[in-house]
Amino acid sequence: MNDKTLYKKISLVDYSVLTKIMISAFNEDTSMHTDLKEDGPTGYNDDSLIKLLNEHENFESYKIDYKNNTVGAYTVAINPNNEYSLEMLFIDPKYRESHLGSIVWKAIEEKYVDAKKWTVETPDYSKRNHHFYTEKCGFVFHRENACGNGAKSFIFEKQK
């Protein structure tokens, strides 16, 4: 753990703050890579996505506190055979230059040392995410996924 970065279980009182951060992070990524000003996964802008992720039986969700501020969150799905999935990772764009994504990913790998395989899915247009997962975290492209409405995502994997 970085001395400035803490990971705490998400509680109901965190939903509103985390949703605001999620809106900012997803909308920034969307506007950077598309003609849209705002977009994200269903429920990203009304507390329902963070609630769903946090309350799912096989998921573990943590908020990320940096310098005494909540700056994001992550959710890990724990699947059979030590195959894990990073369901969500978002960080407030104001903290992007702090390299928190890399710090958080390293902490996740240290927490889940028994993981033999990691999977993450991200929009096909999100070049910055592709770079982060492949160049910073060691994932490799696995396949493309058709999501409906013409949307696509890329699935990346990392084997240990």
PLM feature spans:
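Conserved GNAT acetyl-CoA-binding A-motif
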Residues: K111-D124
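Conserved active-site tyrosine of GNAT-family acetyltransferases
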Residues: Y133-T134, F139
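Conserved beta-strand in the GNAT
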Residues: S61-K63, N69-I78, S85-F90
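A short helix-loop-beta-strand connector motif used in the catalytic cores of GNAT acetyltransferases and
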Residues: Y44-K63, G72
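A short, internal acetyl-CoA/4′-phosphopantetheine-binding micro-motif in the GNAT/acyltransferase core
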Residues: L89-R96, T122-D124
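Conserved GNAT-fold acetyl-CoA-binding loop/helix
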Residues: F26-I50
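A short beta-loop-alpha structural element at the N-terminal edge
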Residues: L6-K20, D29
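Conserved acetyl-CoA-binding loop-helix of GNAT-fold acetyltransferases
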Residues: I91, E97-E110, E135
